[in-house]
Amino acid sequence: MTASQRTLMVMAGGTGGHVFPGLAVAHRMEAAGWRVVWLGNPAGMEATLVPKHGIPMEYVRFGGLRGKGLKTKLTLPVNLLRACWQSLGALRRVRPDVVLGMGGYITFPAGVMTALSGRPLVLHEQNSIAGLTNKVLAKLAKRVLVAFPGALPHAEWTGNPIRAELARTEPPQARYASRSGPLNVLVVGGSLGAAALNEVVPRALALLAPGERPRVVHQAGVKHIEALKANYEAAGFAAGEGVRLVPFIDDMAAAYAAADLVICRSGAMTVSEIAAVGVAALFVPFPYAVDDHQTTNAAFLADAGAAVLVQQRDLSAELLADWLRGQSRASLAAMAERSRTLAKPEATDEVARVCAKAAGANLEILQ
């Protein structure tokens, strides 16, 4: 690190919904000449993922309380005090000019110690319903940013930082107009898959006449690919009959861009990516998400006519088949165009600019 180089500390962990947007901002700041250090949990996915991106790490051990037993709750004061001490040590070693909190349990002790040490704290909430940690830390932060309007009071709506290739996708009008033939449907359950989609979609397609069926790419989740193959076989589909089954998709930008319709869950990053690309979506929120935030995430697009929201309890093969019969490429293109108008494709740059400004940096460095 040079004497004039500024440092950003990103604190995020636990799930990809926190880590991936943090990485997008981290890379943007590195491109602008900043040093970036990541604060995470040694037991979290970030401990494996972040070093692969060449970003050095500091660690704090701290877990959540939701669904945990009595022992965890009784030891909370000791664990919290230890996490605060570890956070303070990391802050003293790294000496960041600004700290960006992207969520995860470690954000609470690290965020508190950031504020108490007098360093500027910037918070970003990815979901439409803010978690408890960000609700508390928002009172201590210098700037508060949200991906969905209204998630936190007095916050700035920046959108979710996403991968650059998603924001560069060709506009939906041009993509849809260039296609003919059956609709292209992408089914995505996330990296772990979604059992409800894996079960219902094959049966729904079987209810459609051959001439009504779309072409389908169905991402199963690595652990569920064999079960998904069995589901399609049970529904009467032989391999290669207009259906391609994959365990994981590396290039989501290309997959979204090739689709007329995406059938998926409605995690914060999924909703933000779909809007950024501009593609029609049928959202089936995960019914056990904390505070049912996936329903509210999906409603952001659905309420504007930019997507369709179906609760898992209402989803059936018959309902899905009937709905698919009523869709055309033109109707889906209109939905996709509305979705694109609600996107925040410059979110990564905007969050980076806010961090720079909070540190007192010249914004020209991020232009």
Curated annotation (Swiss-Prot):
One of its GO terms (molecular function) is UDP-N-acetyl-D-glucosamine:N-acetylmuramoyl-L-alanyl-D-glutamyl-meso-2,6-diaminopimelyl-D-alanyl-D-alanine-diphosphoundecaprenol 4-beta-N-acetylglucosaminlytransferase activity. InterPro entries: GlcNAc_MurG, Glyco_trans_28_C, GlycoTrans_28_N. Pathway: Cell wall biogenesis; peptidoglycan biosynthesis. CDD domains: GT28_MurG (cd03785). It catalyses: di-trans,octa-cis-undecaprenyl diphospho-N-acetyl-alpha-D-muramoyl-L-alanyl-D-glutamyl-meso-2,6-diaminopimeloyl-D-alanyl-D-alanine + UDP-N-acetyl-alpha-D-glucosamine = di-trans,octa-cis-undecaprenyl diphospho-[N-acetyl-alpha-D-glucosaminyl-(1->4)]-N-acetyl-alpha-D-muramoyl-L-alanyl-D-glutamyl-meso-2,6-diaminopimeloyl-D-alanyl-D-alanine + UDP + H(+). Its EC number is 2.4.1.227. UDP-N-acetyl-alpha-D-glucosamine binds at residues 15-17, 127, 163, 191, 249, 294. GO terms for biological process: carbohydrate metabolic process; cell division; cell wall organization; lipid glycosylation; peptidoglycan biosynthetic process; regulation of cell shape. It comes from Burkholderia orbicola (strain MC0-3). Cell wall formation. Catalyzes the transfer of a GlcNAc subunit on undecaprenyl-pyrophosphoryl-MurNAc-pentapeptide (lipid intermediate I) to form undecaprenyl-pyrophosphoryl-MurNAc-(pentapeptide)GlcNAc (lipid intermediate II). It comes from the Bacteria. The gene is murG. It is found in: Cell inner membrane. This is UDP-N-acetylglucosamine--N-acetylmuramyl-(pentapeptide) pyrophosphoryl-undecaprenol N-acetylglucosamine transferase. Keywords: Cell cycle, Cell division, Cell inner membrane, Cell membrane, Cell shape, Cell wall biogenesis/degradation, Glycosyltransferase, Membrane, Peptidoglycan synthesis, Transferase.
